[in-house]
Amino acid sequence: MILVFIGPPGSGKGTQASLLSEKFSIISVGKVLRTVMESNTAEADVVKKFIKSGKLVPSNITNKIVVNALKNIEQCKSIILDGYPRDIFQADFLQENLQMDFKVLFFDIDDAVVLRRLRGRISCTDCGTIYNKLYCMPKINGVCDICNSSSFQNRVDDDESIIKLRLESYKKETLPLLEFYKAQNKLTLIDANQSTENILKKIKKMSGIY
């Protein structure tokens, strides 16, 4: 099974994916794109330009990332695809290249909550694990839970002006996917304004794996 997580930045997709990682392989397109942005490849400058402007990275880049990631995961594995597809073109591409059944979870959240959450978001410089100053800090203050690094940073795309551009881009490009997947009876709406615990319970119940 594949669970596709779709929602605006700051809606909690990555947090839920991390909490479910014991039973799911995680493909976080945003995380992979940030890795590409820091590399010495021809695509790095292109990705950096789009992320810093708050726009969607071109589909020819994200599609290739997703296909390569899916090839590297065992066929028997359950998968969470976090942050993809982001428009109708990518949704069509995904269905053409996906050999497994999938469900789409749409994280619905108020813009004001998104802005508040993203202002407090930080990530580990070494492994990329995301934390939040408001509700999800490392268990030991200043030490990453995953790799024990003490180096943290604010993400370049979490600047407030960029956040607002990302939300505008999301509403224009990604929201139409609601009707696309509703028509296929694949869509489940998640109230992402709720607590992390309540959202996790709902996802576990509907996945049928727990």
UniProtKB/Swiss-Prot annotation:
Write down the Pfam families for this protein, in alphabetical order: ADK, ADK_lid
Using the UniProt annotation, give all residue ranges assigned to the region (LID): 120-158
A Gene Ontology biological process term: AMP salvage
Question: PROSITE patterns recorded for this chain?
Answer: ADENYLATE_KINASE (PS00113)
EC main group: transferase
Subcellular location(s) of the protein: Cytoplasm
Q: What Enzyme Commission number does this protein have? A: 2.7.4.3
Listed as disulfide-bonded, the cysteine pairs are none
What domain of life does the UniProt record list for this protein's source? Bacteria
The entry's Zn(2+)-binding residues are C124, C127, C144, C147
The molecular function GO annotations come to: adenylate kinase activity; ATP binding; zinc ion binding
In this chain, the stretch annotated as NMP covers: 28-57
UniProt pathway: Purine metabolism; AMP biosynthesis via salvage pathway; AMP from ADP: step 1/1
Keywords from the named record? ATP-binding, Cytoplasm, Kinase, Metal-binding, Nucleotide biosynthesis, Nucleotide-binding, Transferase, Zinc
Catalyses:
AMP + ATP = 2 ADP
Q: Where does AMP bind?
A: R34, K55, L56, V57, G83, Y84, P85, R86, Q90, R155, R166
Q: Enumerate the NCBIfam families for this protein.
A: adk (TIGR01351)
Family under the similarity heading: Belongs to the adenylate kinase family.
The record's note on its domains: Consists of three domains, a large central CORE domain and two small peripheral domains, NMPbind and LID, which undergo movements during catalysis. The LID domain closes over the site of phosphoryl transfer upon ATP binding. Assembling and dissambling the active center during each catalytic cycle provides an effective means to prevent ATP hydrolysis. Some bacteria have evolved a zinc-coordinating structure that stabilizes the LID domain.
Q: What is this protein called?
A: Adenylate kinase
Gene assigned in the entry: adk
